C-alpha cells in the first residue's frame, strides 16, 4: 500500500508536496474486470486531459450531468445511471479493479449514459470539468481518516467545497454520505461555513437518504446492526 502524491513546484521552483485524500491499494484485476476494461473502455472510458470536457459531445446530448467522486466497485453508480436514463453520469475512481467492476456491471445493465475516469478526482475536477456544468456532485463514504493527526487528509475541506461550488450549476447539489458520525459533523461544519451554499436539511443538519442514492449491501447490513449513515446535501445558490 503506497500513498499517492504528485510532484508540484511553486513560482520560485520550490517543491510542494501535495497531500492526497486517498491511498492506492491496487489489487489484482480479475479476468472479468480486465476483459471489461478492454471491451468497454473505448465507449465508456474517459482518458484524462487537462482541458474541459464538452459534455454534449461526450454524451451526444444535452442533459443534467451527475459526477461521483470515488465510486468504489461502482454498483450503486451503475444502478443510479440505470434508474435515471434522462441524466448523464460521470464516475471517477483511482482503483483499477473498481473501474473494471463498474464497466462490467454497466455493460450487463446496458446503460449508455455513464462515463468513467481512472484518475485522481482532484485533477479531473480542477482541469477537465468546466465551471458551472454539473447538476450534482456525489461523495459517498470517503475515507474518514479518523485519527486526529490525519484529519488534514480528509477530502472535505474549505478549498474542496469551493472547488465543487464552482463546478456546480446554480441550483446544483453537493451530496455527501458517511457512516462515520464525527466525519459527518466535520462535513457539516465545513459546508455551513462555505460561501455560496444552502443546506437542504430542514433543521440545518443532515437529510434522510434520498431515493436517488441506492442502499448498498454494506449499508443495509449496518442498519440491521444499528449503525448509522449520515447524508448531507448542499445546494449552490451563488
Curated annotation (Swiss-Prot):
It catalyses: guanosine(46) in tRNA + S-adenosyl-L-methionine = N(7)-methylguanosine(46) in tRNA + S-adenosyl-L-homocysteine. Coiled coil: none annotated. The active site is at 143. Its EC number is 2.1.1.33. InterPro entries: SAM-dependent_MTases_sf (IPR029063), tRNA_(Gua-N-7)_MeTrfase_Trmb (IPR003358), tRNA_methyltr_TrmB_bact (IPR055361). Keywords: Methyltransferase, S-adenosyl-L-methionine, Transferase, tRNA processing. One of its GO terms (molecular function) is tRNA (guanine(46)-N7)-methyltransferase activity. The keyword Methyltransferase applies. The keyword Transport does not apply. Pathway: tRNA modification; N(7)-methylguanine-tRNA biosynthesis. PROSITE patterns: SAM_MT_TRMB. Substrate binds at residues 147, 179, 216-219. It holds the Pfam family Methyltransf_4. One of its GO terms (cellular component) is tRNA methyltransferase complex. S-adenosyl-L-methionine binds at residues 68, 93, 120, 143. It is an enzyme of class 2 (transferase). Catalyzes the formation of N(7)-methylguanine at position 46 (m7G46) in tRNA. Belongs to the class I-like SAM-binding methyltransferase superfamily. TrmB family. This is tRNA (guanine-N(7)-)-methyltransferase. It comes from Shewanella baltica (strain OS155 / ATCC BAA-1091). The gene is trmB.
